[in-house]
Amino acid sequence: MSNEKGTLSIEEQGIDTISEEERKGTPASLFWPWFAANVSMFAMSYGAWALGFGISFWQATAMTIIGVVISFLLVGIISIAGKRGNAPTMVLTRATFGVEGAKVPAALSWIATLGWEISLTTTAVLALSSTIEKLGWGSGVAPKIISTIVVVGLVVVAGIFGYDLIMRCQQVITIVTGVITVGFFILGWGHIDFSAIDSVPAGSLPAMLGCCFFVMTGFGLGWVNIAADYSRYLPRNSSNGGIVFWTTFGASIANVFLIFYGLLLAVSNADMAENVGNDPIGAMASILPTWYLIPYTIVAVLGLMSGSIMDNYSNGLALLSFGVKLPRTVAAALTAALTVLGVVYVTFFSDTFIGPFQGFLTTLGVPMAVWAGMFVADVIIRKKDYSTADLYDPKGRYGAWNGKSFAILVVGTVLGWGLVVNTAASWLNWQGYLLFFIGGKEGSWAAANLGVIVALIIGLAGSLMFQRGDIAKQEADLPVSEA
């Protein structure tokens, strides 16, 4: 999309490289999309889920902050690759896996972003329909149907129009949701029982780590596979440090405050904490006066839609990176259609939300954690910009397949799945096959989700050890990066 075209013109770019004349913005501009996508009332639900690990209020506070910041730091580091190659994340990963081999992580990314889009859109639909019912404007299935049409429709429009409209929308969403969220904090303050904070007993180290890894998987690790999609329009002389800071800060700051406030509410109201599993946003709304339900719904739905919009856009790019020959707009529309099916299933046919959600996060979180570790290592090792032409040529410097990368991915995934367990989703009972080393599936370490962090470390360490030579050969005759 050229700089001369208006915000409401449809983006023409697919997975091709952004040309020099089309590059624009500064690292600080990354604050808006990442803040908007993460200023979601849904984040407060993690306060209740964190306490569900059987840890104290202060343990949960520390673990959630650490999990949020570290996971989004990974997003910030991966975002550097966007301005180095000016192409989508799943195109840039071809330098690691090969032009043809990168179709595997592209497929994983497509599934992951689709799952996240369904999760966020479902929560937005539940929030909107719950408010419609509480205001007496409808009951039964009608509010859910109307909410689905409204939410999905807006997500599709933004996803189809593309990058410029998304960036403008995120700036507006940031301001609106920020103001209304402050209002929620003020109105909810009277429902906090500060004496209950110290009444929750401390938990074990495995429980603390389980909380931290769950938060990492639910926040930053859910965004790593699309990080470069939103930095790819930046000029190549943009500051690496600025990209990392503004991405990490923008994505983390709202979540830190929202989760902490959610912890305060959850520790003060056991019934609300229990109801979060079925209707995360609706449970939090139970403490509000009726007159504030509309503003609350606006901030809840806008925050969730912001994340859904980014997922819809990046999901289309991942599909194109896989090799599907479609216009980007058609790919975005196809993603939206699949999202509708997912939303209908979760909203009308699933008894609980958190069980399938945790199962999805854990299962796909493991291979994506391996990939994230590998990509972070690539960014650290690589000192020069990508050869953009070779990213599209299987016979170029990046080759068609990279056996080392797949070996690391397979080893990390197999070991990672062996160290995670999810009792809330029966279809994942096969996981945790390596936990017998540390007490079995019923032991104290079972709920720690060690597999996620082990997978991340294997991806990072494996690439640092075994892929330095490959990267050195790839960039031997390339010019030095501008920044």
Residue ranges and their predicted role:
Residues 176, 372-461, 476-480:
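C-terminal membrane-solvent junction of multi-pass transporters and transport-like membrane proteins
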Residues 52-53, 80, 96, 104, ...:
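Membrane-water interface regions at transmembrane-helix termini and the short interhelical loops
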Residues 146-188, 201-204, 245-247, 357-365, ...:
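Membrane-interface loop-to-helix entry segments
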Residues 1-58, 207-214, 232-242, 470-483:
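Membrane-interface "cap" regions at the ends of multi-pass membrane proteins
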Residues 63-97, 107-121, 464-471:
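Juxtamembrane transmembrane-helix boundary signature
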Residues 39-43, 66-74, 109-120, 154, ...:
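Selective recognition of specific alpha-helical transmembrane segments in multi-pass small-molecule
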Residues 27-44, 185-191, 201-265, 287-312, ...:
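Hydrophobic, membrane-embedded alpha-helices of multi-pass small-molecule transporters
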Residues 23-27, 161-174, 225-257, 272-283, ...:
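Hydrophobic, small-residue-rich membrane helices and short re-entrant helix-turn-helix hairpins
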